[in-house]
Regions:
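Short amphipathic beta-strand/extended segments with alternating polar/hydrophobic composition
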Residues: 14-22, 103-110, 182-185
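Mixed-charge, glycine-accented linear interaction segment located at domain edges/termini
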Residues: 5, 10-11, 127-130, 195
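Short, acidic/charged, Gly/Pro-enriched secondary-structure junctions
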Residues: 5, 66-109
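Short polybasic amphipathic segments
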Residues: 2-8, 92-94, 173-176
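Oligomerization/assembly interface segments of phage tail-like spikes and tubes
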Residues: 38-43, 47-73, 118-132, 201
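Intrinsically disordered, low-complexity segments enriched in serine, threonine, and glycine
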Residues: 132-222
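Short beta-strand and beta-hairpin "edge-sheet" elements
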Residues: 30-31, 89-132
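Polar/acidic, low-complexity leader/linker segments enriched in S/T/G and N/D
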Residues: 1-39
Length: 222
């Protein structure tokens, strides 16, 4: 049956469905995010002009997540309060035991707690989670510029478009496709024009030999 972990990204506090909330996970439903579309009617022309990828990428709406739980309990009201006090109304990371390397992020709502024949039933839902499931750990890649002063780096990205935060121990220039920008030493930079695509992304670094450069970014997938 598995379990669910809920984590508050602000405080780091975590609740596991079975050991902390004393719930048995019965089923999980993870909906798909609808595609955001931009369609224009062209007077005098048949059909529609589809501009959905005018920004060079697919865009998505929110997605729903719902977890149905049950539990044999002696005190319905104590159980109801325990779960609602922990989760209800909070924007939380939701981890499923089948895929603990990713989490969904959304505002959680705890439904009505019903009891029938001593069995408690409750649905915990997050109807408007972010469209992507995020990697549990931020991706970090550190490289060192060789004596030549030039280094090619390939950054792997799961799927979600993301611009990495770049920090260097000395002044450096980063080139990515047609985008080139300079960074100062020991300052964090994020250039939204340097957005990683799914898969392999080639960058070039120009800096003094021995300069260390750190790339940090949040990966995600549908």
């Amino acid at each position: 049956m598995g379990y669910v972990k809920f984590k508050d990204p602000q405080t780091g506090e975590m609740w596991r469905s079975d050991t902390d909330l004393h719930l048995i996970r019965e089923s999980v439903s993870v909906g798909r995010p609808d595609v955001k579309t931009i369609e224009l009617e062209i007077p005098g022309a048949s059909g529609l002009l589809d501009c959905s990828e005018i920004f060079g990428k697919r865009l998505y709406d929110t997605r729903p997540v719902a977890i149905a739980c049950g539990k044999t309990i002696a005190d319905r009201y104590a159980q109801d309060s325990l779960v609602k006090n922990a989760l209800h109304g909070k924007r939380l990371q939701i981890f499923l035991s089948e895929d603990l390397e990713h989490y969904y992020l959304g505002r959680v709502s705890v439904g009505e707690f019903a009891v029938s024949a001593g069995i408690g039933k409750v649905t915990i839902s997050a109807p408007k989670c972010d469209p992507y499931k995020y990697r549990a750990e931020i991706t970090r890649r550190s490289v060192t510029v060789p004596d030549s002063g030039t280094l090619e780096v390939v950054l792997q990205n799961e799927f979600m478009p993301v611009a990495p935060t770049v920090t260097a121990t000395a002044a450096a220039t980063i080139a990515f496709g047609v985008v080139t920008y300079s960074i100062e030493a020991n300052k964090a930079y994020k250039n939204l024009d340097m957005e990683l695509a799914p898969g392999s992304n080639l960058l070039r670094i120009y800096a003094a030999a021995g300069t260390s450069v750190m790339f940090e970014y949040q990966e995600g997938s549908l």
